[in-house]
Swiss-Prot record:
Keywords: Heme, Iron, Metal-binding, Oxygen transport, Transport. The keyword Amino-acid biosynthesis does not apply. Heme b binds at H59, H88. This is Hemoglobin subunit pi. It comes from Cairina moschata (Muscovy duck). Gene3D superfamilies: Globins. InterPro entries: Globin, Globin-like_sf, Globin/Proto, Hemoglobin_a-typ, Hemoglobin_oxygen_transport, Hemoglobin_pi.
Length: 142
């Protein structure tokens, strides 16, 4: 899925705002994921999944760092996330559908934080970008 120059610009522009609150948005996105899709909790049996827990915030930070790497390497998301894709496919064995669910939760969290900036065009660009991220993370399953 190729992003246009305008879509890339929209993703990068919003990311500059998201980056300042990335850890909080990451934790919020995971909280949304676990409350909306409780079956996803099975991948974190060793985590304290209560709201605001250190482990939840830590993993949210890792998730958003990966999104930041994808933004930074928007022309080579595949290369930027290759090791993460292998980790989730071969070692953690996360069901690929969960990446789509998490990306949706990230989209909701970003939209909720920046409603005036999250125009329909920005929404479409971020949706396409996160779909690309999700697609890259599931490539190794094939």
């Amino acid at each position: 899925m190729t992003l246009t120059q305008a879509e890339k610009a929209a993703v990068i522009t919003i990311w500059t705002k998201v980056a300042t609150q990335a850890d909080a948005i990451g934790a919020e996105s995971l909280e949304r994921l676990f409350s909306s899709y409780p079956q996803t909790k099975t991948y974190f049996p060793h985590f304290d999944l209560s709201q605001g827990s250190t482990q939840l915030r830590g993993h949210g930070s890792k998730v958003m760092n990966a999104i930041g790497e994808a933004v930074k390497n928007i022309d080579d998301i595949r290369g930027a996330l290759a090791k993460l894709s292998e980790l989730h496919a071969y070692i953690l064995r996360v069901d690929p559908v969960n990446f789509k669910l998490l990306c949706h939760c990230i989209l909701c969290s970003v939209a909720a934080r920046y409603p005036s900036d999250f125009t329909p065009e920005v929404h479409a660009a971020w949706d396409k970008f996160l779909s690309s991220v999700s697609s890259v993370l599931t490539e190794k399953y094939r």
